[in-house]
């Protein structure tokens, strides 16, 4: 069965088969984790993303990882938090489902997720963490090629949320 674990640190340094990028709809880079991934991957990533012609909220697209340790970058566009009554939970869950499906299609054995929509998109951290954990745990039997799913936390507060929801041992750093 697929192992789900928590790791606190810089997602761009993880040696996994695929990392997920919490992108904006243009896929051309932005702030937060999106900007960090684009900077670490190099200019080739922007060129590859231009060919994808953007991405809708809740969907996902894949490129090579270029200068990253990860072979692939899965770009997904999370919802902007608008109070919770505008389909945000389903759109966020869809980001995880579609990203996992692309990881499996690419033959990835390991995939790492940032906290999608938790930066400038303003999703409440507790709710976002619960959706992330629920979706990766629900989807893992369906994605048999995946041996490891890593939930990457940007700080100890988010790491502790994931850890509590997973009921797991201390966070790796």
UniProtKB/Swiss-Prot annotation:
Cite a single Pfam family from the UniProt record: Macro
SUPFAM superfamilies of this UniProt entry? Macro domain-like
Q: Where is the Macro domain?
A: 1-170
Molecular-function annotations in GO: O-acetyl-ADP-ribose deacetylase activity
InterPro entries to which the protein is assigned, alphabetical: Macro_dom, Macro_dom-like
Q: Which domain of life is it from?
A: Bacteria
What the record says about family reads: Belongs to the MacroD-type family.
NCBIfam families attached to this UniProt entry: PRK00431.1-6 (NF001664)
Name of protein: Macro domain-containing protein PA3693
């Amino acid at each position: 069965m697929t192992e789900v674990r928590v790791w606190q640190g810089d997602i761009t340094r993880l040696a996994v088969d695929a990392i997920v990028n919490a992108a904006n709809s243009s896929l051309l880079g932005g702030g937060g984790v999106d900007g960090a991934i684009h900077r670490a991957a190099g200019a080739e990533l922007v060129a590859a993303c231009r060919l994808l012609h953007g991405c809708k909220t809740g969907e996902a697209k894949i490129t090579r990882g270029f200068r990253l340790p990860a072979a692939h970058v899965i770009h997904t566009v999370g919802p902007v938090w608008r109070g919770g009554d505008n389909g945000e939970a389903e759109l966020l869950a869809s980001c995880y489902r579609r990203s996992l499906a692309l990881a499996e299609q690419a033959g990835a054995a390991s995939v790492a997720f940032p906290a999608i929509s938790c930066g400038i998109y303003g999703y409440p951290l507790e709710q976002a963490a619960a959706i992330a954990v629920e979706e990766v745990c629900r989807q893992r039997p369906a994605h048999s090629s995946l041996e490891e799913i890593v939930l990457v936390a940007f700080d100890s507060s988010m790491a502790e949320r994931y850890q509590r929801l997973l009921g797991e041992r201390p966070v790796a750093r």
